[in-house]
Amino acid sequence: MNTREPENLRIVKEKYRILREHLKETNNEEFEMLQKPIPITAHTRTETIGYNTNKGQEIGLCISGDTNKIMHVLIHELAHSTIKEYDHSDKYWDKYNKLIQICKELGIYEPITQKTKFCGKDVQDK
């Protein structure tokens, strides 16, 4: 039985660590809730590209794709952990866009400007 973590998941977890460390080092109060690691569960199902349980108790990610697309979904799910609402409200998109910008500046994410397939769904930055 192979118990090694898939390489693309390992890379995304390292980028996630870099983001958390940056938020700690800069005392980013807006994203203070993201400074502690959230457990990540990987899957290869195509009906769900990502989910967030109880605002950061666990994040599930489809890992059938390249690391940038996986990171896109992780950022999307992390943004859900920053607001009380469960929908994609204006407040959600504000937090999401700020996280995208931080990750871009850290060099751990390249924006996806065109609709692109990932795990059977279209993903794109808004």
Model-derived regions, located:
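Metalloprotease/metallohydrolase-associated module, dominated by Zn2+-dependent proteases
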Residues: 1-69, 85-126
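Active-site recognition of the HExxH zinc-binding catalytic motif
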Residues: 72-84
